[in-house]
Amino acid sequence: MKIAVLPGDGIGPEVTREAVRVIEALGLGDIEMKEAPVGGAAYKAYGHPLPPETLEIARLSDGILFGAVGDPDCDSLERHLRPEQAILGLRKALTLFANLRPARVFKGMEDFSALRPEVAGAIDLLIVRELNGDVYFGEKGFRTAANGDREGYDVMSYSESEVRRIAHVAFRAAMGRKKRLCSVDKANVLETSQLWRDVMLEVAKDYPEVALEHMYVDNAAMQLVRAPGNFDVVVTGNLFGDILSDQASMCVGSIGLLASASLGERETEYGTFGLYEPIHGSAPDIAGKGLANPMATILSAAMLLRHSLGLEVAADRIEAAVAKALADGVLGRDLGGTAGTTEIGDAVLARL
């Protein structure tokens, strides 16, 4: 089993270090972790945010543990050389098409949510977002109409095969949870969404144990605030998923607890190849000070073990240890506590 560790910039190296410690402490044996530079750190050393050697290490792995990229020193570089291009390059080169964003309020964390504690406490959902299609990747541009009026346009489109592959990811995720899947679209006005809904219904026949429901995106946004506990797995397109996943993040209350996965088409010997990262950025203002909360990265490592290495029990152990540490009051500064990066890592290790 091979894990590519790409720490990146800012607090990336600090938080990935704690996640690596947790993986090592599990005593799983046959896991090889190989570190490689990425982002601004890679540009400064090799002249490119995603060196060929780093990409090759990523390709040969079963899963990637990614820290964060972003360096103020690189802000004046040409766009293709900026640190952020590393993650975009990895997604494209490795055909990562399915973003998994869990949103869970751990016991004792209810007051950090923007919602009432009794509502927030019920949140435990997973948003599955398609990454490679939709309006972000359609034809776009500017044009001048016959009357001289300037127009901007972006074409929203999905192919049946694109919808089908994300549908299978979502149904499989639902099979491992409460067997409930909500497909979010806008089929009452968009042809793209009508195709989306048709394909979801077809794929549902392969998963008779999963209860599928459909919801318009405007209603989904309301229900996510009104009764988030009613959701288990949510699957949606790129644009809607971009918005809903950030909304779900605020329902949780702190990005320091939010992990994510981007899965590809390749099946490894143990699971599905993917890239795993916290949703927070590189936070250069606190880099190197031991202040960053590594829990999101540790939870990302748990997702890697579950989805790419097939180590469900090990992933459960990590998540339980994080939950116990939070319940015991081990809080980073993002949660109003005083615990530093290493202290939080030690607390999780002690509760494995």
Curated annotation (Swiss-Prot):
Site residues by UniProt (Important for catalysis): Y136, K186
Coarse class of the protein's main subcellular location: cytoplasm
Pfam families hit by this protein: Iso_dh (PF00180)
Matching InterPro entries: IsoCit/isopropylmalate_DH_CS, IsoPropMal-DH-like_dom, Isopropylmalate_DH
Positions with a binding annotation for substrate: R91, R101, R129, D218
Binding site for NAD(+): G281, S282, A283, P284, D285, I286, A287, G288, K289, G290, L291, A292, N293
Residues where Mg(2+) binds: D218, D242, D246
Assembly: Homodimer.
Protein name stated in the entry: 3-isopropylmalate dehydrogenase
Gene (UniProt): leuB
